Regions:
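Short hydrophobic-aromatic micro-motifs
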Residues: 51-54, 117
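Short, surface-exposed charged micro-motifs
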Residues: 41-43, 140, 150
Length: 199
């Protein structure tokens, strides 16, 4: 085991905050070894010689699991072909490895998804955008502090956008209300209201 002396991170789903471990002075082989070891329940990334492991809290899971429900409802409504990619590990050896909370390809399946979604309770942000830029993910959504921000990749890097390019009827400031309800309400109720809103 690569780092068993420092694991497990607390994976108690009653924790309200994510648990994060950062390991400096690592290389790509260390990262690959970690991915091959048995550390279930963690999201892992590699960038600039640092491996980051995150054990999601229950609130993190609630938010990350509402996105697939809303995106599936949108794609059914507008007959958009989509391919869920979940937290599939994205790699550009030997620079970057990243596991998003949720990811999707639209139209056709692809090695690099069209959309990656990050739920941020305790870490992430600008550095994660740089990881996605190197990976070439066209669109990234960040949920943080009950706010939702859409970013689109261009020649100068990511720029904030109000309306999704991947799902062009979704506006960040409108969608976030449905996402935040995932903390306290049943997904069935949220999906029903979302379906009415996008008709």
């Amino acid at each position: 085991m690569l780092i068993n002396a420092q694991l497990p991170i607390s994976s108690d789903r009653l924790n309200r905050q994510d648990q994060t471990l950062r390991l400096a002075d690592m290389n790509w082989d260390d990262y690959e070894q970690l991915l091959s070891d048995d550390y279930p329940g963690y999201l892992a990334s590699f960038f600039n010689g640092v491996i980051t492991l995150m054990s999601p809290s229950i609130n993190h899971e609630k938010i990350s699991q509402i996105f697939p429900i809303l995106i599936a409802a949108y794609c059914r409504q507008f007959k958009l072909t989509y391919f869920p990619r979940g937290s599939t590990t994205l790699k550009k050896k030997p620079l970057v490895g990243k596991e998003p909370d949720v990811s999707y390809a639209f139209g056709t399946d692809k090695d690099i998804p069209d959309l990656a979604i990050e739920v941020i309770f305790s870490s992430g942000g600008i550095e994660d955008l740089e990881k996605y830029r190197i990976l070439g993910v066209p669109e990234v959504w960040f949920w943080q502090n009950k706010e939702l921000t859409f970013y689109r990749l261009g020649d100068a890097g990511y720029q904030e956008i109000a309306v999704s390019v991947c799902l062009p009827k979704l506006v960040a400031k409108n969608l976030v209300g449905f996402v935040n309800r995932g903390m306290t309400e049943s997904p069935l109720t949220i999906e029903a209201d979302f379906n009415s809103d996008i008709k």
